[in-house]
Each structure stands twice: as C-alpha cells, then as structure tokens.
Amino acid sequence: MTRRLLLLFCVLFLLPLATHAAWWSWQPLAADWRRADWSSASLLPAAATESEATIHVFAARVGRWRGVFAHHSWVVVKEAGAKAYTRFDVVGWGNPVRVNHREADGRWFGNAPELVAEVKGDAAAALIP
C-alpha cells in the first residue's frame, strides 16, 4: 500500500514538476537581472485614453530556476481621469512597497506578465483609497 502511494505521488506530482523544470531550463533566460528585459509588454492601453478608474493585477514568472515555482505579482491602479498608471509591488521579504519602480505592464526578469484580475469603472473607483 505504501509503495503504491509513493508511486502515485511520483506520477502525479514529481513527474509533472520535473517535466516543467526541464522545459523551463531550455527557455532563453537572461543571465542576470542587469541583462533582463524590463520593458513594457504593451498589455495596457495608454492611460490618457482610459477615462474610467481601473485596477489591474499582473503576475510574471520570476528569474532563473525560481521561475519553475514562483511568480512575482503587482497591482496597477489608475484613478478616473488620471494621465498615468501607478504600479505597486514588493520586491523581497519585509521590504516596503515600491511605487512605479518599473513600467506598469513591464516584463519581470524578461518574462511577460499575465493579467490575473481587472476591475473597471465605479467598482474600481470604490476600491481605490
């Protein structure tokens, strides 16, 4: 019974994890953070063209081997009528929140972000302090 559970664990957890790690190791990654692409992924429209309030939550895989397991996430806010987005993210445990450290929809360590959640209009305005 124990051997079957161990085999089941290996098949259902370790095999997919190893496969993903192998795939990830073959991806073209920057050697270090200085060489990574941090530019905008052009996922957001120009802030001036959006008249309503918006809140976006983005996530992108982190750099090097940690990208197998982890994502970096951040929140982008734009008040109604604002001419620019404001990005909030935390880099490192226990560090303060960074404001506009990177492009609102910028890549993270060369990895394109994905939109996790979006709130627009009056609902977004109610959530923005």
Residue ranges with predicted function:
Residues R4-W23:
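Hydrophobic membrane-insertion alpha-helices, especially the h-region
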Residues P28-S42, A48-D122:
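Glycine-rich catalytic cores of cysteine/serine-nucleophile enzymes that process amide/ester linkages
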Residues G121-P129:
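A structural motif
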